[in-house]
């Protein structure tokens, strides 16, 4: 049995640990320039926007290699704007201005990603980050599709993400005010129609069906790693009961996993979703570049305090999920109880 007063003491210790880590990280942040805090990531997003015209023009070419280059450019730029851009904007990590943060959220989430800004903030920031790996709240259960077998889910289901995303957004609009719903519908339509129009009028596609097929291909280019990353970094790790969840530092160190540096995914998805996911969950308002900068501080601190710091390779997680798909993606995960840490 735990001694009387043990839980409050552990809770106070956990808060003290988090406070100590926050102080170390804030010291690094204060010593960083604007370029390090925001500029690097803004430059990557700006380059992605500037690369779109060459990408559309490459699709005019009769050369298979140039055409493939155009598909690659548009696909990588699409994921950089929709995943990296939307993620940073939703967390308010692109700028310190509240007004501009709202503008960038609408642009990246609704125009580029075809999703609703309100639900992105609620589902991702409030629920997933607020209740990481807590069953029924922030446990990544939205990624589970028990009706699909492992091969369909891991290899075919990602191709449907570009189609499912706007459909889910429209379904969520029932829960918002009419004015907000009309705004979201307008911005989603603007984003989709803009790409369609550019494919017909700049890239020279001769039929609506070929333009739509190209849209699906470019928007599916990195769909497989996008889905995989979202399940690899939380599912299969300790899950917690809503009424017995641990303190924040234990929740994030136990329930989050970092992948190694992967150049294409680091660029398109951002460090905070790939190699610095633990850091991102502990400090969600930091930009990708700052997550990378504070990574040695966080890693050293967690190891120093003998706290978990989960890391694994993409391929190792991939094979693990194929082998244990039923356990991870179909069955209800077991609850981890941490005596004295709740």
UniProtKB/Swiss-Prot annotation:
It comes from the Eukaryota. A motif (Histidine box-3) lies at residues 277-281. Its main location: membrane. GO terms for molecular function: oxidoreductase activity, acting on paired donors, with oxidation of a pair of donors resulting in the reduction of molecular oxygen to two molecules of water. GO terms for cellular component: membrane. It is a multi-pass membrane protein. A motif (Histidine box-1) lies at residues 87-91. InterPro entries: FA_desaturase_dom, Fatty_acid_desaturase. Pathway: Lipid metabolism; fatty acid metabolism. GO terms for biological process: fatty acid biosynthetic process; lipid metabolic process. Keywords: Fatty acid biosynthesis, Fatty acid metabolism, Lipid biosynthesis, Lipid metabolism, Membrane, Oxidoreductase, Transmembrane, Transmembrane helix. It is an enzyme of class 1 (oxidoreductase). A motif (Histidine box-2) lies at residues 124-128. The chain crosses the membrane at residues 39-59, 63-83, 151-171, 185-205. It is found in: Membrane. It holds the Pfam family FA_desaturase. Its EC number is 1.14.19.-. Belongs to the fatty acid desaturase type 1 family. This is Fatty acid desaturase 6. It comes from Bos taurus. The gene is FADS6.
């Amino acid at each position: 049995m735990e001694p009387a007063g043990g839980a409050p003491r552990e809770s106070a210790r956990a808060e003290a640990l988090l406070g100590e880590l926050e102080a170390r990280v804030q010291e690094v942040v204060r010593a960083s320039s604007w370029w390090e805090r925001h500029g690097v990531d803004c430059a990557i997003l700006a380059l992605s926007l500037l690369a779109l015209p060459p990408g559309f023009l490459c699709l005019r070419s009769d050369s298979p290699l140039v055409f493939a280059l155009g598909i690659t450019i548009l696909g990588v730029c699409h994921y950089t704007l929709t995943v990296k851009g939307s993620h940073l904007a939703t967390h308010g990590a692109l700028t310190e201005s509240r007004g501009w943060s709202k503008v960038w959220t609408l642009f990246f989430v609704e125009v580029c990603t075809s999703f609703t800004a309100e639900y992105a903030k609620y589902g991702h920031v409030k629920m997933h980050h607020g209740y990481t790996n807590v069953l029924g709240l922030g446990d990544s259960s939205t990624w589970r599709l028990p009706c699909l077998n492992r091969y369909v889910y891991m290899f075919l289901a990602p191709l449907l993400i570009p189609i499912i995303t706007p459909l889910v957004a429209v379904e969520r609009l029932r829960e918002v005010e009419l004015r907000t719903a009309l705004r979201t519908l307008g911005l989603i339509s603007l984003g989709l129609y803009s790409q369609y129009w550019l494919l017909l009028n700049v890239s020279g596609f001769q039929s609506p069906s070929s333009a739509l097929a190209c849209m699906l291909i470019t928007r599916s280019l990195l769909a497989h790693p996008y889905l995989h990353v979202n399940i690899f970094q939380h599912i299969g790790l300790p899950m917690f009961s809503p009424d017995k969840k641990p303190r924040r530092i234990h929740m994030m160190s136990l329930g989050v996993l970092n992948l190694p540096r992967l150049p294409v995914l680091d660029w398109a998805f951002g460090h905070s979703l790939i190699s610095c996911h633990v850091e991102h969950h502990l400090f969600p308002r930091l930009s990708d570049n700052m997550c990378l900068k504070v990574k040695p501080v966080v890693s050293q601190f967690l190891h120093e305090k003998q706290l978990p710091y989960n890391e694994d390779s993409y391929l190792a997680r991939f094979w693990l999920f194929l082998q244990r798909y039923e356990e991870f993606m179909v069955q209800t995960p077991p609850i981890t109880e941490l005596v004295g840490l709740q």
